[in-house]
Regions:
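OB-fold ssDNA-binding interfaces and closely related basic DNA-contact patches used
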Residues: 1-82, 87-101, 116-168, 172-190, ...
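Low-complexity, polybasic segments enriched for Lys interleaved with small residues
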Residues: 212-226
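Short acidic, low-complexity intrinsically disordered linear motifs used
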Residues: 224-238
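Polyanion-binding surfaces on beta-sheet-dominated domains and ring/shell assemblies
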Residues: 129-130, 195-213
Length: 238
């Protein structure tokens, strides 16, 4: 049985396995520096049993690592950058943390990161869908209850709506401009992640042999902070 190390392409949401050399079933990828590498794309997402979660330090910063077992017996580590370049929680990581308290170790799920932008949308909807799955045929279990997410606090039409997660606070900067203060939100979600990890019966094994990517998998800072959504992110057309 193999150990598989998976990353997420921020721009597409695709889960991929990286290789420096050409491999059967892999696609060519050329980064912004012109360096070619190869990727095996998991277009259906990752179907796997959740075995553990950890925070790992890498040369490029902290990552959330999901330790999972695939239906064929392979161990898959699905890694997400924890912070963006402004030290806010990265989009995929934040989405994943909001659903972690509803997940169970030993349960099988489909993990599907997404980055969706409609023709008339100004900003993309970025996150991670997690639903119960059947590993024997890599399918979503139809009719199964979806894991619930922590809810956001927000203000709409001057009405404050209280949720689980503290609201983003807008403050006036020294030059009169408005700046976003996400510290309370970030701390709450970071504490939620650590509480989930602390509650696990066992820790995920170390990823000593993780292959180094050709470029740092940095999560870009969003051009605009993602507004809390009232609709369930997992009501997706896939």
């Amino acid at each position: 049985m193999a150990n598989i190390y998976l990353q997420v392409d921020y721009k597409t949401g695709n889960i991929f396995q990286f290789s420096k050399t050409i491999q059967e079933g892999y696609e060519s990828h050329i980064n912004t520096k012109g360096t070619e590498s190869w990727r095996k794309i998991y277009k259906k997402g990752l179907y796997a049993k959740l075995e553990g979660v950890s925070i790992r330090d890498t040369d490029f910063g902290k990552e959330i690592s999901l330790y999972t077992k695939m239906g064929n017996g392979d161990t898959a580590y699905l890694n997400f950058p924890l912070f963006d370049q402004k030290k806010n929680l990265a989009s995929y990581a934040e989405s994943l943390i909001t659903i972690l308290p509803s997940l169970k170790v030993g349960e099988s799920y489909r993990f599907f990161p997404y980055n969706i932008k409609g023709d008339n949308d100004k900003y993309a909807n970025v996150g991670v869908s997690v639903v119960l799955a059947d590993l024997s045929n890599e399918s979503v279990i139809e009719g199964a209850a979806k894991p619930t997410r922590l809810s956001y606090s927000y203000t709409k039409n001057d009405i404050a709506v209280k949720g689980d997660i503290p609201a983003i606070v807008w403050e006036e900067d020294f030059d009169g401009s408005r700046t976003m203060n996400s510290k309370a939100k970030n701390k709450f979600l970071y504490d939620t992640l650590n509480a989930f990890i602390a509650g696990l019966s066992g820790s995920a094994p170390a990823q000593a042999s993780t292959p180094a990517p050709t470029a740092a998998p940095k999560a870009p800072a969003p051009k605009k902070p993602a507004a809390p959504v009232e609709a369930e992110n997992d009501d997706l057309p896939f």
